[in-house]
Amino acid sequence: MMVDQIKLLFYNKMMDRTAIKQLISRLIAQFGITYTTNILDQLKTLGFKQATNASVSLGIDDLLEAPSKAWLIQDAERQGSIFEQHHRFGSVHAVEKLRQLIETWYATSEYLKREMIPNFRIIDPLNPVHMMSFSGARGSTSQVHQLVGMRGLMSDPQGQIIDLPIRSNLREGLSLTEYIISCYGARKGVVDTAVRTSDAGYLTRRLVEVVQHIVVRKMDCGSTRGIPFKMTQDRFKRNLYQQRLIGRVLADNVYLEMRCIAMRNQDIGNELANRLITIQKQLVYVRSPLTRKSISWVCQLCYGWSLTHQNLVELGEAVGIIAGQSIGEPGTQLTLRTFHTGGVFTGDIAEHIRIPFNGIISFAEDSVHPIRTRHGHPAWICQDNLSVSVKNKNRIHNVIIPYQSLILVQNNQYVESKQVIAEVRINQSLPKERVKKHIYSNSEGEMHWSTIVRHSPQHRQSNVYPVLKTGHIWILSGSLCNVIETSSSFYKEQDRFNIQSVFTKPEFLPYSFGRNKGEKNQLTNLHKKGQELNHLKFDSSATIKTYKFPYLTSLFYCKIRKDKTENKVILSIKPIQRRNKYYRKTPYRDFVFQTPTNGILNRGDILAIHENPEYRIHISGVIKYGTLKIDSIVENERIPNDREKTTFGSRYKVLRGGNFFFLPGEIYIVHESSAYILVSNNSIVQAGTQITPTLTSQLGGLVQIKNIQKSFEIRILPGTIHHPKRIPSISKQNNMLIPPGQSVFDNLKFDHWIYLQWITSPRKKTFALARPVIEYFVRKGSYPPILNLLKEQNTLRVKFLDYMLYEDGEEIQIKNNMSIQLVQTCLLLDWEKKSPIKAAKTSILELRINKIIKTFLQISLLNSFDFYVKGSKFKRFFNNKKSFVADSIPKTLESQLSIKHQGTIRSVSNRKTSFLVLSPSDSFQNSLSTNFQYYDSKNRYGKKKELKWNTFFDTKKVSRSLKKNYLSSIKDSEKRSLNSKVGLTSVSSFDHTRQLQGMKILGLLGYLYSIANCFLYPKGIFRNEVFFHRDSSIDDLVGFDKLPNWYFLDENRKIYSFHLRNLIGKRFFYWTRNLSNFNEIPLVNLGQFICEGARLFENQISSQSGQIIALSPEFLIIRLAKLYLATKGATIHNHYGDLLREGDTLITLTYERFKSGDIIQGLPKVEQLLEARSVNAVSRNIEDNFKKCNRVIAKFIESPWSFFFSAKISTEQSRKDLVDQIQGVYQSQGVQISDKHIEIIVRQMTSKVLTLEDGIATVFLPGELIELPRAQRMNRALKQLIYYKPILLGITKASLNTTSFLSEASFQETTRVLARAAIRGRIDWLKGLKENVIIGGIVPTGTGSREVTCQMDLEKHKKGSNLKIKNTHSFSCEIKDLLFNHGKVSLTFKRSNIHRELKKPLSENDSD
């Protein structure tokens, strides 16, 4: 007894729940259940006594918070603000921001949870919360963490993680927002309690149904296979691996060096498990129900221990029912929460590598490649193991970073202690899938993008644009106003208006006929609160008139010179291509101006042509297209003249760049007799040979002569002649292009392109002619698709297009030593087809600043959109007695004001005066003539006076009249208040169709509108003279004239401001003497998009993102914008320049996510795995692995056997993956289940195969489910093999595809199953427990099992004869004597005889 006590272990440590379990297990193994029960009673009594003496109670003060919580949360919030800032800058998109935010808060919560346990142990080890939770008595670590740590991230009703974490804990109390977020989980918890019990019960029923017939029938089935257990060095996983090893049986011997430490078929106890883990052997093979020979029973050694008794399982044990209940019963402990993150987070913290001290890091830059992390940050990935060293003055630290890891710092960068320098990749590659996430606009505005897109070919009629390169999407701020159909806006483009202003007015329809009568409407005053205005609409009548107006003028800068020798105007254009955030400069290209003298071009006309000398040839030959793709529609080349357009030749638009080839060769047509031909057919000539008395060949080569009607065609084909050894294959390679390196015949190869042509001589000899080929490339994208104009607009487009001048197979003949161009690059004018624009006028404009002359090509669009409006006559112009405007406005202009402006008269009701506010417009058309008629204020009903006008409208007279009449009745104290409220703006322009002597169109050069007041300064240009409107400002009745400032940016990026002073002759020069130089603006330009934080000036950065819409010496105007990052593969759902409302779909991002990271817990995950849902990765992988293995194995083994080996390999791998995934779900909930229970279930799910059509025999139909052992036996017996593939059946489907129709009918679909069984004539062999219970027989388990009965009879026989069984051979002999000889012992027996006798008393026997 003392010796036994010495062998016992002595425990002297604090024991928690896990340690108590281990102690009880050791006590049962050492003393048995009876002695263990007595010991545990004493332990229970001791526990209650100590608890009473301690008087442990739980108070709110016992909930101790970790001191590190404050700075952890502060650090997470700081990182969150950095993420938000990067998102505003456009550095990361919404998915990357959400992913990083979730991972940051999850890591913060986990670190706080890890700090909680040491905090309790250090501050108060006897804390009641600490003793209760961490001893395992009540409460988990997660629950205590919510009490004293932070609740962390929660999910919404759809299961998506909310990016707003709950920072507080239950001890501190929750805010209102945090409480509402918590209610999501609380509601789901209440539902879980009511539902999960029924779900778990149904799961248990299905599990028991599929394995109810599995019983332990034999001691050893003879299986030599096993499953591997890979040992780990991770101390956190050692206990898990030890528990999984205990109770198993070894499938092979285990050796330590040359010594055997464990034998096959030896069961693994606690000591052996510890020893196997200690020696850290890589692989240990153990027997498993997955590798048993039979699918209908299991042996003792494959099953292992019965964990209840810690000994080998007894024969006749119904281990299938035990397995089903062991898996289903813990389902009540699981949650039903479908807690997923949309794929942005997997629930694991990545392993980081940190450095121990400050220093400079260095590594080989050639071994790393740049990459974008899942958070959108730049990093470098190493393809192999990377050696990294950190140096400072005193120490050097070397570390090896595993391959495929991310390097987060640059080479030779200074790093600080504990800084993360690398992130190690996950060891196992998780399956991924590509998903889409819609990004919605959170503001109204106008859409722009700065990336490369293309129109989706699948959505030709919609606005879907795939992104080809990562870039930004900009939403320029703006508010959309809904205007009713019968209203139009007071304001035009670029107008400024007050928020309280009336925005719309009733529409004056241009195509309506009849009389429109004035109506009075009560409106809110624009400028003074509390006053009302009477709104009166113009009345129109009389005749119909037509008015035309100029549409738009655009400029772009180019160098222009005139070639006097060829009488051509040459434009030197320098295209600028944008690449990411940089501009790529290209050399100047010369384009020959192709416009007529009148400068009028239609849509699609060629503006200029550039001929690249690389595509110019000087010899005759044939054109052959390669990968070049052209438009099927042939366009005629048109050279415009003054009166008409002459058509000659054809041109073919290049749709896709590629290569084409030119085959040199001469062609001559001789109309004389053959006697004049000095060369013979199929002869070889050299260059300079006389062909006829008048023709000399320019090339050398083979001569081909054909008789064509009354003439002869003579071809000179240069090349080399080759005679093949065998002729039969010549037809396959006749008249075709051969690329370099390709074998032609007889292993003949060329290092350049050739054109192979087979020729048969008159003597019936065939030879090959390898003709030389010149390859040309047309690179689509060498020019920008659209030329950048100086003014941003969407109407006019000047496009670069490449044209081929000859079609495929066309012969080109050179005469008189001329040269021919093959490819031309053209500038084409283009605008919308539905636009009223019918033509465009081009002209050349020169601008001189000091001594520098700049040349601009100006394009003015003309339209013929006619407004047919009744000639107007004001029935009532004003409410007051004086018509001050009528004195100054001619009748012709008066009618046009009613058309374009539809001027609105507002009169103040409590005064006897009126004031007029006309909305400014820069597109007003004024049809001027030399004589104008106007109304006199004294005779306003018809007396006419002649006013000779000099083709422009004097606004100064209007201003004076306005001041005189309108302000005469206004008090001085009220004059200042009306400043910037009253203004008359109009534009002096002309009709393009009117033939005025000396009139030329110049256009707008783009000056800065003053924003100091509400006046605009449009201008008109006539007869080489420029006139500007002079605005009228009402301030102390002092009028002044103001010309707008013009701004130019020179080559040194300096801004100059000047006024227009002098005009020079008839040449188109603008000249000024005085230029004032302003501060340098090094980074921004007009129209440029800038991000928040971008540097505007040397000492100033932008605090907002937006677009620069105005530059001034004193300020910048930035239109606010919201930018979004669109990565490659994303989809834009709107056109460029579209107006969006808040909530509209903006872009769709495409990204990868882990398939296994969607649902990480709960019964739904278990059911998804056990039912083999289509979303389950194992269901897809079993078929994918089968195909991959079959392709590889088929290279070494014949096709039929490759199917069988592939099915075996893929099935075994899928079984192991499915066991690990099911076990992972339960372990994530803290539930421990033995692997052998799950393995029994999984074996039944993978026990069948699906027959295929390939080589099918007449035994089974295609698509029929059969057992795998049965298929293997049939293949051994039949001459014609059965082809099959593995399949993963769910537990429900597996229960309905068994050998027992009684079991199937009692489970589901009773009527269908019984009907089909009756039609087929099925036989139920009553192998399972359920079938025997239904018919009232003895269940084949326990004492009803035949093996158990034989074992009991054998024990009785042994006691009677007192025989000792020394080995397995004598034991078998006694079985034979018992069955056959009834007491006579025989030393010879056959196993088949025993099986034959076992079949007699019962109707069936288990088969392998």
From Swiss-Prot:
The keyword Zinc-finger does not apply. It comes from the Eukaryota. It is found in: Plastid, Chloroplast. GO terms for molecular function: DNA binding; DNA-directed RNA polymerase activity. It holds the Pfam family RNA_pol_Rpb1_4. One of its GO terms (cellular component) is DNA-directed RNA polymerase complex. One of its GO terms (biological process) is DNA-templated transcription. Keywords: Chloroplast, DNA-directed RNA polymerase, Nucleotidyltransferase, Plastid, Transcription, Transferase. Gene3D superfamilies: 1.10.132.30, 1.10.150.390, 1.10.1790.20, RNA polymerase Rpb1, domain 3. Its EC number is 2.7.7.6. InterPro entries: DNA-dir_RpoC2_beta_pp (IPR012756), RNA_pol_beta''_euk (IPR050254), RNA_pol_Rpb1_3_sf (IPR042102), RNA_pol_Rpb1_4 (IPR007083), RNA_pol_Rpb1_5 (IPR007081), Rpb1_funnel_sf (IPR038120). It catalyses: RNA(n) + a ribonucleoside 5'-triphosphate = RNA(n+1) + diphosphate. The keyword Chloroplast applies. HAMAP family: RNApol_bact_RpoC2. DNA-dependent RNA polymerase catalyzes the transcription of DNA into RNA using the four ribonucleoside triphosphates as substrates. In plastids the minimal PEP RNA polymerase catalytic core is composed of four subunits: alpha, beta, beta', and beta''. When a (nuclear-encoded) sigma factor is associated with the core the holoenzyme is formed, which can initiate transcription. This is DNA-directed RNA polymerase subunit beta''. It comes from Psilotum nudum. The gene is rpoC2.
